[in-house]
Each structure stands twice: as structure tokens, then as C-alpha cells.
Amino acid sequence: MQKIETFWYFCLKHFKQELNGQQFNTWIKPLKLEICPDVENTLVLIAPNRFVLQWIKDNFVNRIDEMAQGHFNEKIHFKLELKDPAEIKTATIKAPEPKSKEDKKPPTDKAHGTTARKTNPSRLNPAFTFDAFVTGKANQLARAGAIQVAERPGIAYNPLFIYGGVGLGKTHLMHAVGNYVMELDAGAKIRYVHAEKYVSDVVSAYQHKSFDKFKLYYHSLDLLLVDDVQFFSGKNRTQEEFFYAFNALIEAHKQVIITSDCYPKEISGLEERLVSRFGWGLTVAIEPPELEMRVAILLKKAFIEKIELDESTAFFIAKYIRSNVRELEGALKRVLAYSRFTGHPISLDLAKEALKDLLAIQNRQISIENIQKTVADYYKIKVADMYSKKRVRAIARPRQVAMAIAKELTQLSLPDIGEAFGGRDHTTVLHAHRKIVELRASDPGINRDYSTLIHILRG
């Protein structure tokens, strides 16, 4: 097999064109291809950890195999292996678990937590774990990145920057990393801090002339978790202190995880030197959950809370509550409260009754005409352009955005949506939706526009 280097170069080139940069750098670039010394006509695909290994196995190994059969003149077999033999050999997508029983901390007292957590200096929420986090297409990359960081803090991706709308699970993932690291090392110095609290700490240090104490604490952490960093906007002294803390931790190979409601470069009032450093590691987005994921979230929440919830009721709630996980869980609590108040078990009819006011508000506010006018005004085009046959990008792209939003926010069928856009067929609507999903993953500007329009329409 003299052409192995040529073959792997061909594979990398192919996947680089097919995937966006973030996906390619996370899943494909870390792979290595070698000839198996023990088995004839066999190539070994080496992954850096078990999560990349599982993802490649699920998504790309068959594709690579097909390309190999077309490249070589002989039948080629593939083996998947981990780079470090000491790592767990079984490819699984389960949440991280302690490496051995000896590594585990004593059982947690539910009333007080473990000895290390009685005062909870870390500010971690023990309920936010990887096991409690429901995974779907909207968040799988962010979860995979968080798990890799949890297993190799300070090494895998530093910093890890997670961005997305309110209530999508950014804080949950951040706490999950902290809880996992704490589970492995009860003595680890971990601090979760909301950006507003960090600002408050800076102000307090300024007032009491205690910056030495402030720096000693934040610069000595093993894991710093900063939530909603957009609140640093315009606060120059806070940004300066965080810049020093960030540098100190990164240089010491200590992990930093940051969340924001938008892409780092879109945070106004943030110093360029911070924006640049936020891009040193891995930046991942969390999108609003798709229908199947919303159903899974409801069923998991019901299981944890010991609530009887059948799939049809969960599907009904998930179908109409689409913005974020927080509102989804809020709707479930409302249904549960109504059930307890009336003394009737949770059912589809009860859920419809409990949520009728909420659903009426949503249905009244969002119509396809409202979507078309809002999108047209936003992009400064005519509403008539939504129905026209014009294909220039300045008109076609807003039209695709409007179709995608209509699919997400209304209950209209694809043919009905197409009819509302100048008699287009359902395949045009489906193509528009898929195109916008792709662009939101690769183009921060489109993602920002889409999120802003959703926010405007939902009021």
C-alpha cells in the first residue's frame, strides 16, 4: 500500500470541503491513518479519544471505507483505535465516569453533599451532570467538546467557549464539566461565577483595595467557569482583570470555560485582545432543540421528577413550546401544577387545557404574514419580494430566512408555506430551511439575524 499518504490527503481534502471548519477541526483533523503491522491489507484509523472514535464510527467510517475501495486496487479493511492505549477501549457515548472505584468520592449525602461540598465554594449545581443532559443535533458538538474538556482539563480545548440563546443548556454543560472534575478530584479548586458576580468582585476589590487577594484567588483556580461573558461589555477594569486571570490560568494549563449569548466577535464593547484569546480553544454553538430532542427532554425531566408523562402528551407540549429548554420545562411544571390543582392525572386533554392561554398567545402573535413583513422590514426589502420570482441574493436569502422561520414558528404544512410565498412547492421550502440551518452553523451573521428575528416575532 504505497499510496496511503495520497489516500489520506484525498480524504482530508474531501471532508474539508464537505464540513464546516469547526466540525473538520474537531472530528477529522485529529485523526491519524497508519498501516496495521500485524494484519495484511488493513489500515488503522487512530482517534485522540473515545468520543471522537465513537463519532467517526457512527458517521464517517463507512464513507472512508468506500473511498479506500475506490482508491486502492485491493480490498482494504479498517480498524478503529485510540491513540493512548491507557484510555478506555470501548467506544461509547455515555457520559464520563470515574476511571475506577478508587477514584470515586464517598457517596453523596443528599441533604448536605459531600464533605468537600458542604460550603460549596465552587458554586456548582450538583443536579447539572452529563447524565442529566439530553443530547441531540442542536447540542451534540458542544456536549462532545465539554466531555473532552472534562476528561482532559487544560489540555483538550482551552478555553472552551459555548454560545447560544437563553435556556438552551450552556450553563448546564458548564456545571457538568465542573461536577465531573470535582468527582475525580475533590481537592480541585473550581469556581463557577456569573459575569455579573465577577464584575461585583472586581468592584469590591477596588473599593477595599484588595486586588492582591482577588488575583491570588482567581489566578490559583484549577477550573474557572464564567457564565454570560457578554455582561463584561463596556466594563474596562473588569476586562483588564479577567485578561490577567485568563492568561495566568492558560499559561498554567488550567481550564477556562466561557459562555455567551452570541459569537465572541459579535459581543459589542469587548476588547479585541479578549475576543482573540476566546478563539484559542474550541468555540461551539448550541441551537434551539429540534422536536425529537424536546420530547426527550420532557420525558427525561418527568422521569427525574417521578412524573407520569406519556409520549403523546410530551409530543404535544414539545410541538408548541419550541424556543428553549427553560420554557419547555416551565410548560411541564404548569401542566403538573394544573394536574395537582384539579386532582386529575396528566393527559393530553389536561395538557391542552393547562396550556391553552399560552398557546393562544403564540398562535395569535405569529402568522405567516407577520413573519413576511417582519423579515422584509429587517432586511429593508418589499413584502412583495417575498412572493416574487426574483433570485438575486439580496432578496432570495431573506425569502429563505422567512420560509425557515415560518416552518419553525407556525403550524402550517410545507405546501401551505410554499403557497404563501408566491405559489412555491414544498421542496423549495424544505430546501430553504436546510440551507438556513447550514448557514447558521457556518455564518455568524446569518445566525445572528435569524435569532434576532425569532426574538422579535416572539415578543
Swiss-Prot record:
Ligand binding (ATP): G167, G169, K170, T171
Subunit structure: Oligomerizes as a right-handed, spiral filament on DNA at oriC.
Region entry Domain I, interacts with DnaA modulators, spans: 1-74
PANTHER family given in the database record: CHROMOSOMAL REPLICATION INITIATOR PROTEIN DNAA
Keyword DNA-binding belongs to the record: yes
Domain IV, binds dsDNA as annotated region, ranges: 340-459
InterPro entries named in the record: AAA+_ATPase, Chromosome_initiator_DnaA, Chromosome_initiator_DnaA-like, Chromosome_initiator_DnaA_CS, DnaA_C, DnaA_dom, DnaA_N_dom, DnaA_N_sf
Job of this protein: Plays an essential role in the initiation and regulation of chromosomal replication. ATP-DnaA binds to the origin of replication (oriC) to initiate formation of the DNA replication initiation complex once per cell cycle. Binds the DnaA box (a 9 base pair repeat at the origin) and separates the double-stranded (ds)DNA. Forms a right-handed helical filament on oriC DNA; dsDNA binds to the exterior of the filament while single-stranded (ss)DNA is stabiized in the filament's interior.
Gene: dnaA
Biological processes annotated in GO: DNA replication initiation; regulation of DNA replication
Keywords, alphabetical: ATP-binding, Cytoplasm, DNA replication, DNA-binding, Lipid-binding, Nucleotide-binding
Signal peptide, first to last residue: none
Domain II: annotated segments: 74-122
Protein name (Swiss-Prot/TrEMBL): Chromosomal replication initiator protein DnaA
Annotated domain remarks: Domain I is involved in oligomerization and binding regulators, domain II is flexibile and of varying length in different bacteria, domain III forms the AAA+ region, while domain IV binds dsDNA.
